[in-house]
Amino acid sequence: AKVLYRIRVHRMQVDESYYNEDYRGQYHYSVKDGWANDPNGMIYYKGKYHLFYQYYDSPNWGPMHWAYATSTDLIHWEEQPIQFYPDEYGTMYSGCAVIANHETAPAIFNEGEEGLVFFITSNGGNGGDVQKITAAYSKDGETFHKYDEGKVLINWTDDSLKNTAFRDPKVFRYENKWFMVIAGGPLRIYSSDDLVNWQVESVYGDLHTECPDLYPLVVKDENNQETDEVKWVLDRGGRKYKIGDFKQVNGKWSFVPDEQYASTNANGMGNEDNDGIMNFGPDSYAAMTYYMGDFGTAENFKAQ
């Protein structure tokens, strides 16, 4: 029988020389070596900005992990150990993080506890080449655990679209409820009272995107002063966006685009070229808002 060994050889360099090499950007965070893509789980907690991101220990794309770095000022970063590794449910694709406590996530936190909850796309694994949503948590912002050993919380079969492109969850809190936007293919919106049990609110089979985000912004007047009006932004991977309202339609929470952003299909949510342009950089992708702790509460309704 033949035995194959895989050995990874790194250049012998001190940390300083990595970051002083030719063409290395100095302002934005960059991984020391290996493959990195989408930012994940961006959250501010206990005086630190936490940044997770897609990572593989190779120059080429491979089985995704969640690597990790922290900062106190968004300029100076400290690399931390990799936190989430592939498991029986699959490799670790993109996701997000929120702050919760016993009242808002009683299955995860005991009375008096709070911490971070992560939502991760598990890709592949024992279930085949499909995508599903799993969770993890931290009660101190320093040690991390997969929830229920990585158990699947939401599956691609749970909504009427039955589309296996089911990834990139982004969670936010609004009206005393948790909401999740999921895409990768078509957009879906789910809701939950406890971050564990999720229900379908609305689906948009004609609108395809990756790395969705949905957040409110206060409208400003012609003098650049804030008004009482709030609009919601559906961010399509940091490249394009739609502006509209997030509200109940026939008892289901839905994103309803303003007329200038709407398409001609029934729910106004198609892929026609009527989106706003968020940036023109061809390599700028998978943008995500930083979760600042009390986003979605009466104390801090608007995104920062």
List where the protein language model places each region:
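Beta-rich carbohydrate-recognition and catalytic domains
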Residues: A1-P212, P216-F280, G293-Q304
